[in-house]
Amino acid sequence: MGYLSKLVTSVVFAIPLASAHLAAYTPGMYCPENSYKGTLTNATDPNLVVFDPLYNLPGDSWFLSKGRNCLLAEPTGVWEIAANTIISVPWANWQNSTGYYADGKEYNERPIPYSVTNPEVIAEGLVSESKGLASPNLHAANKSTAAGTAIAISYESNIWAVTMDTLVVISTAPQTPFERLANYSIPDLAPCKECICVTGWVPDGFGQQNMYMAAHKCKITNPTGGKIPKTPSSVPGPGVKGAKQMIAAFQSEGNNVEWNGGEVVPTYSTRMGYLVGAQTDIFD
């Protein structure tokens, strides 16, 4: 495929914005108000908002959006996830979002189909300079080019103890984010009163090549028992089986996947070994 997977040892807005990017919003989200509101001024990421992209950052800055001090902006609740179900998660720019699309617009408030090839979309100025849809900023030309998003879990209650090795991707949702709500099939996970979940997205073109990562305090329920995913998780890549890490790419250090311009983009899809939907191989 042209890209090489390898470990690198070095390791506030109240309303939606048309130009904004996207994050997954849950009751357990760190930076629930979109950014850290404390008095510290030691941020190492020039982008301070949780839905902004992560790009060209050192490992301790991009991982879990630490460089934005999001780990100091505690969640206001807990994200409860039931194993062996399908859950819906909003991708948006603000908490308690509404609408069919992530910018708050309903289905009938956008041209149908919502695609850059639709003359109505072009006429309304909804095509970005990077040839993708401009609002919301989906890094996609239409639903079929939406790269896919993922949920990962670490069976750690202390977020400061979470590492890439303890995180395991548990579900992917192809052709997301596009609509505001993305649906994820959850595998047979063991119960967990307090774990750390992480949502991620790697766009496939239509703008700067970057990634997104947001942390959440989560709780897993499963009346039938379930299992804990195998760790340490493996670096994702073509044909990789079993429990896999999240994708870390396009950063100055700490990448687990190296990418050069013109190569196939590593996304949360089968091209990096992920299954579609529930990652049922994570217990093998």
Curated annotation (Swiss-Prot):
GO terms for cellular component: extracellular region. Disulfide bonds join 197-218. It is found in: Secreted. Residues 1-20 form the signal peptide. Pfam families: LPMO_AA14. One of its GO terms (molecular function) is monooxygenase activity. Its cofactor is Cu(2+). Coiled coil: none annotated. Its EC number is 1.14.99.-. Binds 1 copper ion per subunit. Glycans are attached at residues 42, 96, 142, 183. Keywords: Copper, Disulfide bond, Glycoprotein, Metal-binding, Monooxygenase, Oxidoreductase, Secreted, Signal. Belongs to the polysaccharide monooxygenase AA14 family. Lytic polysaccharide monooxygenase (LPMO) that plays decomposes some specific network structures formed between cellulose and hemicellulose in the plant cell walls. Catalysis by LPMOs requires the reduction of the active-site copper from Cu(II) to Cu(I) by a reducing agent and H(2)O(2) or O(2) as a cosubstrate. This is AA14 family lytic polysaccharide monooxygenase B. The gene is AA14B.
